[in-house]
């Protein structure tokens, strides 16, 4: 899908198992996002390379609406939901932490039965796209090995948005932390991880 990138910023990304979402939904969301990106790019062209604040805000509101739409469909639990199994989740957990500290700063994630939410900050020259590819490749290799399968495990596309400010960051952290509960999952069906810094901030916050 079309993506906006800014060096040194945090991103909220969602990637999913290949059988978790109907192809027509993916194509519809892709077309909507592309139309919006063209609109913002044209606004930037007209305004000396930078879209006006209201256009940029509208684009980000659209992204959040897309994420909500995506989440509603994914939480229906379509497909085999391989990540419901602890050993498959552990393969993904290992992959998510493999590059922590040298390719990305991992801030939070929720592993759901058929999809994953990640909040992270790519480091140096590493891109979110390269991180997504690595996480998928490493976890797929291990899960396929356990199942004796081959072929595509993950959908190639991901859905992501740029974290725009501290308020947005806090809302994403809360969303990730509460996602399994919101989806009415049992503790054994999902996994949530928050950076120790976030955990400490949560403990220090007034109740």
Which role fits each region the language model picked out?
Residues 1-207:
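Short catalytic/metal-binding and nucleic-acid-binding patches
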